């Protein structure tokens, strides 16, 4: 069974056993279980159901495999002939999760 979920400001279509990289869940450790209640749609074929905007009672549970930081993104700004240069870096905090079950 597939489900479309919304978590950490992003939408994903997942099935059981999928591994995703999402924005980090606050105050969680690796090995913790997260329940995602914002399920937008579930099913395949004739069993497909769409929520308005979410399905009541549908829950997707996921296990956090690890918390890590993403690749460094360099933001460089320059204005020609003005002598202005600015270089900043950013690394996004990420969580790697594995979808364990989809309950409708």
Curated annotation (Swiss-Prot):
One of its GO terms (molecular function) is structural constituent of ribosome. Disulfide bonds: none annotated. Keywords: Ribonucleoprotein, Ribosomal protein, RNA-binding, rRNA-binding. Pfam families: Ribosomal_L21p. One of its GO terms (cellular component) is ribonucleoprotein complex. GO terms for biological process: translation. This is Large ribosomal subunit protein bL21. It comes from Opitutus terrae (strain DSM 11246 / JCM 15787 / PB90-1).
């Amino acid at each position: 069974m597939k489900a479309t979920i919304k978590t950490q400001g992003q939408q994903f279509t997942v099935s059981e056993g999928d591994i995703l990289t999402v924005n980090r869940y606050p105050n969680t450790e690796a090995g913790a279980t997260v329940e995602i209640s914002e399920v937008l749609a579930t099913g395949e074929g004739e069993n497909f159901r769409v929520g308005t905007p979410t399905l009541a009672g549908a829950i997707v549970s996921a296990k956090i495999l690890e918390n890590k930081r993403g690749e460094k993104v360099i933001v460089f700004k320059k204005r020609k002939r003005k002598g202005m240069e600015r270089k900043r870096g950013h690394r996004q905090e990420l969580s790697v999760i594995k979808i364990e079950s989809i309950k409708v």
